[in-house]
């Protein structure tokens, strides 16, 4: 454990956590899409998290994910931390598969395969869990407000449990979000190759 968490690794955790926290917490780095409710915002804090998991391994990736979530949590208490919990859960399904595969296949091809698997698991899980777990939690807090935001965009939606919410809103939103995160990570792979290919075993 002492060998794994060297000063260089700890410094890397601090740097990537700071970058992820800035992207996650500063409103200027969050964007709304015209075809989704205002509360669904794009944020790209998973980019430094994913890069950290490639550079130092899956464990460090999860640590960075947890730390940036803890930093955000006090700002999300108005939602009882539901949004942070959801982002943490979704992030695990992106970062862990991608970094485990990359650790086994330590090449650009491995990074591509890992990111593809992480992308698919993240999009599928976030779309399903969002509809059947996260949104019902929001409904407990806000009542009908959540599904009414979708109703304003599509009057055929009469319930938060409408499957149409998933394929008309959640799936496209998650596809766009995960595509940007994965594409930027792959584009930065080569410039950061020396960092990513360090021996973290």
Predicted regions, residues:
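Loop-helix junctions at membrane interfaces
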Residues: 1-201
């Amino acid at each position: 454990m002492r060998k794994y968490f060297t000063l260089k690794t700890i410094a890397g955790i601090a740097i990537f956590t700071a970058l992820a926290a800035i992207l996650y917490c500063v409103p200027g780095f969050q964007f709304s899409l015209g075809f989704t409710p205002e509360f669904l915002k794009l944020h790209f804090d998973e980019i430094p998290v994913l890069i950290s998991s490639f550079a130092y391994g899956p464990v460090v990736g999860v640590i960075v994910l947890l730390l940036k979530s803890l930093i955000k949590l006090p700002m999300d208490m108005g939602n009882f931390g539901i949004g942070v919990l959801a982002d943490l859960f979704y992030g695990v399904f992106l970062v862990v598969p991608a970094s485990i595969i990359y650790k086994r296949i330590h090449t650009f091809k491995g990074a591509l395969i890992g990111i593809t698997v992480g992308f698919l698991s993240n999009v599928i899980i976030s779309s399903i869990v969002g509809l059947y777990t996260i949104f019902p939690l929001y409904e407990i807090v806000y009542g009908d407000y959540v599904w009414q935001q979708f109703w304003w965009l599509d009057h055929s939606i009469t319930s938060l449990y409408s499957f149409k919410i998933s394929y008309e809103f959640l799936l496209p939103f998650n596809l766009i979000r995960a595509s940007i995160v994965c594409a930027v990570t792959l584009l930065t792979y080569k410039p950061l190759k020396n960092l990513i290919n360090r021996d973290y075993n």
